[in-house]
Amino acid sequence: MSKASFLREYKIVIVGGGGVGKSALTIQFIQSHFVDEYDPTIEDSYRKQCVIDDETALLDVLDTAGQEEYSAMREQYMRNGEGFVLVYSITSRLSFEEVNTFYQQIRRVKDRDSFPMVLVGNKCDLEGDRQVSSQEGRDLAKSFGCPFSETSAKQRIRVDDTFYEVVREIRRMNKEQEGRSKGGQREAFEMSDTRNDGCCGCILM
């Protein structure tokens, strides 16, 4: 039976502070349109079927609340999630500083140091308002041991690639757990996107 005959479901959780564009990224990926207004999310779930590296996948994407008062609810979603998109806004130093808190929360809930995750600096179309450099994002991702990219939900820059990369991370870690073989160093590569618009397209491994 071919790979395409199997429909594997991937549970992906979007995490980050309020107003960083988590919902905008998710809706751009699922529905291909940009939501401009900010309406704080409590919890929204979306599903999308797509082919990633010649293998059909069903993505179950959970968009979570960034506000502190929903921390307990967020932990429940983290417990059930397989992979995580950890989002900050390049226009907000505070949202970047909050990222480590969310990362530590996932570590505590999952009770392990390593889990499938991608670090995302969103709103890279707002270069003039940048408060967090691309290098800072790369360095933080390196300390987490995860891929990194900068995205724009508004201009649909590297949105699909980000979600695909989380699925690849889940697959990679599953294979490592199954085989416990080499687990060698993955090499850095760049997400290709013709519309750079000053955004960092690096994916650090």
From Swiss-Prot:
Entry-annotated residues carrying Cysteine methyl ester: 202
Topology with respect to the bilayer: Lipid-anchor
The UniProt record lists the keyword Hydrolase: yes
GO CC terms, sorted: plasma membrane
Pfam families the record matches: Ras
Catalysed transformations (reactions): GTP + H2O = GDP + phosphate + H(+)
Motif Effector region per UniProt: ranges: 38-46
Binding site for GTP: 16-23, 63-67, 122-125
Alphabetically ordered keywords of this record: Cell membrane, GTP-binding, Hydrolase, Lipoprotein, Membrane, Methylation, Nucleotide-binding, Prenylation
Lipid group attachment sites (S-farnesyl cysteine): 202
Regulation: Alternates between an inactive form bound to GDP and an active form bound to GTP. Activated by a guanine nucleotide-exchange factor (GEF) and inactivated by a GTPase-activating protein (GAP).
Propeptide residue range(s): 203-205
Molecular function per GO: G protein activity; GTP binding
A single GO BP: signal transduction
Assigned protein family: Belongs to the small GTPase superfamily. Ras family.
Name the record gives this protein: Ras-like protein 3
Taxon lineage: Eukaryota, Fungi, Fungi incertae sedis, Mucoromycota, Mucoromycotina
Gene assigned in the entry: RAS3
